[in-house]
Amino acid sequence: MFIPFEDLPKSSKIWIYQSERKLSDEEVQIADEILKNFIETWAAHSTPLEASYVIKYNRFIVLAVNQEHHPASGCSIDASVRVIQELEQKFKVDLLDKMNVTYKTGEFIAHKTLIDFKKMAKEKAVNGNTIVFNNLVNTIEEFEEFWEVPAAESWHSRFF
């Protein structure tokens, strides 16, 4: 069952999917419809999940589940991956590749392979103050506090 993202407990489990490009406003509107329909019927072992999503910067899809109400199961997580794959096919983007880094350069959001980001760090094109998106955060609370952080405060720090 759909619950507004801001109404879920801060301890809710999240999954972040990033696109290598910014989605158009029209694509975001379509994604909103697909995700809302999915979440309305998302269940684990026939029990509806209290869940939500948010799309940030037209680039990141964040799914969330209130694990205190009922935890997501393997099958329900698989179902969420299938809807993400549906969006990938519809928009011709890659949302599941975790070997990429997304970071800010001023107000612009850039997307690089991990190898390219590592080279950029070595060449000092990015540094510990570069704002990165830490997609390894696990809860809404972590998302709010540690998702957009200086690289020095994230797993990205190993490159500096």
Segments from the language model and where they lie:
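Short glycine-rich or small-residue beta-strand-to-loop segments that form or flank ligand, phosphate
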Residues: 16-18, 61-68
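Short glycine-rich, low-complexity/disordered patches
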Residues: 45-52, 94-103
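Short histidine/acidic/glycine/proline-rich micro-motifs that form metal-
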Residues: 22, 69-71, 104
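Terminal interaction module
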Residues: 96-160
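Broad gene-expression machinery/nucleic-acid interaction feature
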Residues: 14, 60, 98
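Intrinsically disordered, low-complexity boundary segments flanking structured domains
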Residues: 1-6, 89-90
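Helix-adjacent hinge/juxtasegments
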Residues: 66-95
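Long, hydrophobic N-terminal alpha-helical segment
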Residues: 3, 10-56
